[in-house]
């Protein structure tokens, strides 16, 4: 009983120390501004059944404008949800599957490897999915978020943002229209240093 609880508590502490050491190592060895970019609902839903729930053309235009010419890092499921690798960007897939191969994309099996593959790009973008965002959030410097002002049912979620560590740098609200049924905002958060 008590011994098992103690062992579990010690293991949690060791895991937390390992994570913090990994963060320090990554931030020391890679002088990059790591940027998360996502579209999320009010309840942090990213999508359902490996698809986006909404289609907001202005969000897609913004995504293309911001990520074009940069390395984009994503999980396998995100890559497989797209018809092909995104043009004009260095596509990097982070996966645990050592046998995985993909056309027009680089494969990484760890965060440091994904960042190394981003080369000399000082602004690699993390484009999803939920698990990948959770891995990169502790080392991210900026978040480019499209907040869809509605709740949705979904099975992929963006990690909750600890607002004590981030500052809202800019905000642009967009109202629904005939072609666009959702109110949404473009939000840029920067990490408090």
Language model regions located:
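Enzymes that bind and transform nitrogen-containing heteroaromatic metabolites
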Residues: 25-193
């Amino acid at each position: 009983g008590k011994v098992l609880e103690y062992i579990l508590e010690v293991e949690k502490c060791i895991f937390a120390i390992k994570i913090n050491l990994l963060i320090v190592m990554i931030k020391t060895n890679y002088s990059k501004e790591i940027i998360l970019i996502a579209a999320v609902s009010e309840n942090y839903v990213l999508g359902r059944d490996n698809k986006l729930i909404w289609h907001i053309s202005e969000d897609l235009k913004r995504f293309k404008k911001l990520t074009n010419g940069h390395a984009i890092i994503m999980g396998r499921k995100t890559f497989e949800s797209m018809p092909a690798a995104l043009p004009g960007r260095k596509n990097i897939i982070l996966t645990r599957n050592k046998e995985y191969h993909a056309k027009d994309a680089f494969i990484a099996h760890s965060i440091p490897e994904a960042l190394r593959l981003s080369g000399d790009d000082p602004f690699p973008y993390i484009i999803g999915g939920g698990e990948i965002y959770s891995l990169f959030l502790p080392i991210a410097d900026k978040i480019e978020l499209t907040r869809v002002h509605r709740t949705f049912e979904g099975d992929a979620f963006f990690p909750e943002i600890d607002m004590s560590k981030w500052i809202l740098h800019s905000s642009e609200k967009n109202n629904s229209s005939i072609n666009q049924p959702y109110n949404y905002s473009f939000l840029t958060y920067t990490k408090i240093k």
